[in-house]
Amino acid sequence: MSTTTPPGQSALPPEAWAPLLRLSRLAGRPLERFLHIEAASGILLLVAAAIALLWANSPWAESYAHFWHTPLGIRVGDFTFERSLEWVVNDGLMAIFFFVVGMEIRREVHQGELSELRRAALPAAAALGGMLVPAGLYLLLADTPDTRSGWGVPMATDIAFAVGILTLLGSRVPPALRVLLLALAVIDDLGAIIVIAVFYSSGVAITGLLVAALGIVGVFAMQRFGVRSKWAYIVPAFVAWAGVYSAGIHPTIAGVIIGLITPVRTWLGPEGFVTGARTELEHIAQAQPGELSSHHLSETLRRVDAARREAMSPSESLIATLHPWVAFGIMPVFALANAGVPISSEPLDAASWTVALATATGLLVGKPLGVIGACWLALRLRLATLPKGLGMRELLVLGSTAGIGFTMALFIAQLAFTETKLLAAGKLGVLAASGAAAVVALVLGRWLLTTSARPGAARSVDEAERSTAL
């Protein structure tokens, strides 16, 4: 059988080539792939939140609470560990979400928008303003002993919903605005993680910290000894999670720490992969007809696949593997478990009304004011410069989009409020403000943004990320 491919034709079957070509192009643009997944995830999050709200306010509302409080546990001899299904989602599955967040932060610091000070200045200023102003506004409106603990709720931006809104605006949104929003959200997440670790954790138990340190050191040691199998890291990662939990710190912090220490450098690199793959494939090409056995072919393909695997950093590989599961599995389940707020016809009491109003105001008013004001101040003081293709119109849309604070805001609300009525009020404020912010962002985007790009603007998100024009 001839192995010669006519000029201009693919060696792959026609029916397989087109989708594989699209897949390879998408895989070759990691940031665009990330934003595609986030946009689709935002739609799924909206559906999950709507289902939760309808379920919690339907004739079957009791089944909603009963379902999420279903006890789950393990028993080994005299040892019993039992928690509710809601706890499994919020403290267990969300640790994987925070693990991916930790890796994304590390990647951005290593090679993304946060890798250079002059590139990171604008999103850092925007994120800082977008955290401080909402928190300050919340405390201004809800500075009582019962309500002030919720100051951290309106601080974070939900990247999935925010990217989904920008996607609905289509070609009006310049790629540089998407990249700036992503960098802002990454710093927002980092700020929220610090807030959770410092302000929303109970008293620290030293024994638990020692167990957590043992797990983290185990992960680090395995990395240093070159352990490649992802499955091998499950045991030390679980030890770290259990230690952080028993220490009185929220266990999702363990996911963040392990994500931050996941290597972002490749073992082989692009050049090494090209050299290795070319060498292996040349051996096949030089074989005489009948000399190439299926065993030799499979061994060659195995080595090429190993080279492909080693050409990707562990962080990049894990993000590519876990991000779809987090975006389309864990986050919608979290929304389903936490967005079911009973809406009563009875008026809220004073404390609940204060929490709902302060939370909604912090997100809907404080976020845009903080983001836009901090950007203006940083530009005025020449601490940062705008990316090519962006102006104040785009920053107005950025600020309004940043007011969508769904996943992280609901998560912090779970930690901030111990009283059921205050937790429900906080969630109600988050849902109302996020919905209103989404509408405002869409209206402003349609009004302020045009389909014609500014001179010098990047044409894709990866080109915008690579640009050093900041």
Curated annotation (Swiss-Prot):
Location of the protein in the cell: Cell inner membrane
Topology in membrane: Multi-pass membrane protein
Protein name, UniProt field: Na(+)/H(+) antiporter NhaA 2
Gene: nhaA2
Keyword Transcription regulation found: no
Domain of life: Bacteria
PANTHER family membership: NA(+)_H(+) ANTIPORTER NHAA, SODIUM ION/PROTON ANTIPORTER NHAA-RELATED
Family statement drawn from the similarity comment of this UniProt entry: Belongs to the NhaA Na(+)/H(+) (TC 2.A.33) antiporter family.
Listed transmembrane segments: 34-54, 85-105, 121-141, 150-170, 179-199, 202-222, 241-261, 317-337, 357-377, 395-415, 423-443
GO molecular function: sodium:proton antiporter activity
Biological processes, Gene Ontology terms: regulation of pH
GO CC term (a single one): plasma membrane
Catalytic activity: Na(+)(in) + 2 H(+)(out) = Na(+)(out) + 2 H(+)(in)
Record keywords: Antiport, Cell inner membrane, Cell membrane, Ion transport, Membrane, Sodium, Sodium transport, Transmembrane, Transmembrane helix, Transport
